[in-house]
């Protein structure tokens, strides 16, 4: 199973929209967008629409709140993650999860050359692995005391 499988599944559920914001936007604007769309990360782009970085909930907490910065006056370019790790659509889910684990990321950008396909979260990848685990999802829900158990 590959990252493309996850992107297709997100598309089937109407969750494949790629949300971007310019690096010159404020942290407050980014947080507003993230809240509006109930997402945990935004792709940050340059004025030329090139990938500049990624801005995540963790960036808000560790680089803005913890540092005592004013979200209304702080541009994303100062606090976004610039060292973006990415996967291609053909990357296996296991390899993507390993990359997330090693680099402590919850989100990965999906790129193929200069073409930006989207973002996948650890939750998106885990859901697909569990969903295709031939009944393991139901067993995991029962063990966790989830709904219907």
Language-model region placement:
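Tandem CBS (Cystathionine beta-synthase) repeat/Bateman regulatory domains
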Residues: 1-149
């Amino acid at each position: 199973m590959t990252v493309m499988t996850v992107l297709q599944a997100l598309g089937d559920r109407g969750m494949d929209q790629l949300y971007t914001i310019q690096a010159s936007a404020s942290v407050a604007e980014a947080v507003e967008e993230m809240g509006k769309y109930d997402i945990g990360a935004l792709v940050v782009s340059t004025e030329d629409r090139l990938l500049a970085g990624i801005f995540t909930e963790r960036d808000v907490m560790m680089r803005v709140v913890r540092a005592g910065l004013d979200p209304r006056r702080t541009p994303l370019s100062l606090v976004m993650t610039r060292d973006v790790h990415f996967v291609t659509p053909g990357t296996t889910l296991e390899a993507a999860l390993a990359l997330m684990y090693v680099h402590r990321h919850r989100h990965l950008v999906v790129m193929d050359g200069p073409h930006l396909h989207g973002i996948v979260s650890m939750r998106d990848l885990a859901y697909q692995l569990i969903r295709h685990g031939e009944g393991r999802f139901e067993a995991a829900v029962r063990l966790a005391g989830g709904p219907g158990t």
